[in-house]
UniProtKB/Swiss-Prot annotation:
GO terms (BP aspect): mRNA processing; RNA splicing; tRNA processing
Family according to the record: Belongs to the intron maturase 2 family. MatK subfamily.
Source superkingdom: Eukaryota
Major localization class: plastid
Name this protein carries in UniProt: Maturase K
Pfam families (UniProt xref): Intron_maturas2, MatK_N
Name of the gene encoding the protein in the UniProt record: matK
Keyword Hydrolase in annotation: no
Length: 509
């Protein structure tokens, strides 16, 4: 009991983060403008000098505390349009500025922790691919996974309350609460639709910060459980999940864990050294080498704990228990599973020989071909059946520019899916992009694909649509036999920080 109370002890820091005065500093909004502002928004407001003025911010805060300040009169349509445009502009200014301000104490803590532990290359951990080497080393030993869909908080007030444990500045939190309740449509943030508000489209920074704080809140329990159950005590996760606990939660945790005679004897159901937790965006995975009964206990425990102590409504049907040998796990654009790779070893002792069948577990990462084709169809590169089609392009685009844009998409896909175990599935994607590019150029020149390729030459397309593996073979032709092993193996890169959304490319043509 004493160990739990020490772990959950409220940190009595003498330093207070007073962020409210920063809201009225113009240089803060200049930084926010450089980092996240879109100048297209500013151009929609005539008479604005592309500068986040202190007077505008003060005027915004004053209007926020006034009642009915955006009542629209049906008799003045011009004024209505002006108020709507300025409301979106004020929306943009205060959200970007507040997101920049509230990140300051967290950035300072993280920088000080990283400098203290001399982690020079911590930026490599931002890469999406950095998680897959961990999966390769550990998932082959696991049997079951809990596939968890993380729910959103049921009310904006929960996000403000969570942030209150980090930032002890009542004025800033009160302004944030008023801002969210007054302007934000939380449903449009969770499920953005066509024609949604400007905030849901362009102000993702503040929402992502609040959502990550919300997720970090309930993930803090894993640090405690890991320190209690694992032989290797956690030394790095505490930096990322460091938080300030309050006394009411301490009492509730004591009721959960310590209302027993012998705490260590009743922690057996979570005492699993090989339990691993992974999260990305709205999905998390809990993997273990335990049995199905063990995973069911974890499922019941997590659902009950999160619902009662973190105000999260986890529907039990949103948590799936899958066996890795029978199910593929959709995670970060890959289909991952653990399959048995049979191998036959011949052993000979004197005149007798034996054939020994060994089944070795192997972690596979495959390219989800059907979702990729669906993304290509959504971006108008092909139809729903995967047949390439031509894309409408502007007449002022040159042939080399069109080829370069198609080639960039192809290279990005090859770069991201370089960790696939079977790269032959990427050939169909490359074929769709290559033929779609040829049909687009033929449509521009009002010719057929065959006549266009015969006149221009297919080598030109192959030059622009060359994958990274092809570049290796052409650069080092004498080492082709050695590079063939590299081509067949998985390659993980440490410069990938987002998943390519093919739907975003359709606006570039």
């Amino acid at each position: 009991m004493e160990e739990i109370q020490r772990y959950l002890q409220l940190e009595r820091s003498q330093q207070h983060d007073f962020l409210y005065p920063l809201i009225f500093q113009e240089y803060i909004y200049a930084f926010a403008h450089d980092r996240g502002f879109s100048r297209s928004i500013l151009s929609e407001n005539p008479g604005y000098d592309n500068k986040s003025s202190l007077l505008i911010v003060k005027r915004l805060i004053t209007r926020m505390y006034q009642q009915n300040h955006f009542l629209i009169s049906p008799n003045d349509s011009n004024q209505n349009r002006f108020l709507a445009r300025n409301k979106n502009l004020y929306f943009q200014i205060i959200s970007e500025g507040f997101a920049f301000i509230v990140e300051i104490p967290f950035s300072l803590r993280l920088i000080s922790c990283l400098e203290g532990k001399k982690r020079v290359k911590s930026q490599n951990l931002r890469s999406i691919h950095s998680i897959f080497p961990f999966l390769e080393d550990n998932f082959s030993h696991f049997n079951f996974v809990l596939d968890i869909g993380i729910p959103h908080p049921i009310h904006v007030e929960i996000l403000v309350q969570i942030l209150r444990y980090w930032v002890k500045d009542a004025s800033s939190l009160h302004l944030l609460r008023f801002f969210l309740n007054e302007y934000c449509n939380w449903n449009s943030l969770i499920t953005p639709k066509k024609g949604s508000s400007s905030f849901s489209k362009r102000n993702q920074r503040l929402f992502l910060f609040l959502y990550n704080s919300h997720v970090c809140e309930y993930e803090s329990i894993f640090v405690f459980l890991r320190n209690q159950s694992s032989h290797l005590r956690s030394t790095s996760s505490g930096v990322l999940l460091e938080r300030i606990y309050f006394y009411e939660k301490i009492e509730r945790l004591v009721n959960v864990f310590v209302k027993v005679k012998d705490f260590q004897a009743n922690l057996w159901f979570v005492k699993e050294p090989c339990m691993h937790y992974i999260r990305y965006q709205r999905k998390s995975i809990l993997a273990s080498k335990g049995t199905s009964l063990f995973m069911n206990k974890w499922k019941c425990y997590l659902v009950t704990f999160w619902q009662w102590h973190f105000x999260l409504w986890f529907h039990p049907r949103r948590i799936y228990i899958n066996q890795l040998s029978n199910h593929s796990l959709e995670f970060l654009g890959y289909l991952s599973n653990v399959r048995m790779n049979p191998s036959v070893v011949r052993s000979q002792v004197l005149e007798n020989s034996f054939l020994i069948n060994n089944a070795i577990k192997k972690f596979d990462t495959l390219v989800p071909i059907i979702p990729l084709i669906a993304s290509l169809a959504k971006a108008k590169f092909c139809n729903v059946l995967g047949h390439p089609i031509s894309k409408p392009v502007r007449a002022d685009l040159s042939d080399s520019n069109i080829i370069d844009r198609f080639g960039r998409i192809c290279r990005n896909l090859s770069h991201y899916h370089s960790g696939s175990s079977k790269k032959k599935s990427l050939y169909r994607i490359k074929y769709i992009l290559r033929l779609s590019c040829a049909r687009t150029l033929a449509r521009k020149h009002k010719s057929t694909v065959r006549a266009f390729l015969k006149r221009l030459g297919s080598e030109l397309l192959e030059e622009f649509l060359m994958s990274e593996e092809d570049v290796l073979f052409l650069t080092f032709p004498k080492a082709s036999s050695a590079l063939w092993g590299v081509y067949r193996s998985r390659i993980w890169y440490l410069d990938i920080i987002c998943i390519n959304d093919l739907a975003n490319h359709k606006s570039k043509f």
